[in-house]
Amino acid sequence: VNTSEIADRFEIADTLYRYARAVDTKDWDLWRSVFTADATVDYSSAPAGRSGSRDEIAAWLEESFAFVTVSQHFITNIEYSFEGDRAQVRAMFYNPMQFVGMTELSTCGGNYHHSMVRTETGWRSERLHEESLWFVNSPLAQDD
């Protein structure tokens, strides 16, 4: 590993942490800044999840997170595979959250799979696929 790759790893990790902060603070402009303008985002493995363009998913998240009073995304175990100005990135996530009208905490976890590209303004995700592995106390289960 050379010093350039170490710097790239730090910058990509910072991008992932900015993603988490954007979701948890409901800053959808900041969330958009993590992605290229033509990025695709796939949350279809999550309960009631969707996939679409960056802007379509930002609008959906803004609507969906109106029902989330607090969330905290932890991103860890980041793995990188570089090929020139591109990188495949896998990172685990753990997300406790509180939904409107629910007294108990909900939690979920899984993996983020990013296809990242180096741009003039830093590393950006051009494709995100969320691999949702588990969800405890889903608000959707409350409808049963």
Predicted regions and their residues:
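Intrinsically disordered, low-complexity regions enriched in Ser/Pro/Gly/Gln/His and often acidic
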Residues: 21-22, 53, 115-119
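A solvent-exposed, acidic/Ser-Thr-rich amphipathic alpha-helical stretch
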Residues: 28-94
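Charge-dense, low-complexity intrinsically disordered segments
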Residues: 2, 6, 48-51, 103
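A beta-strand edge to alpha-helix "cap/lid" segment located at domain peripheries
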Residues: 65-144
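Short, low-complexity N-terminal intrinsically disordered segments enriched in polar/charged residues
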Residues: 1-37
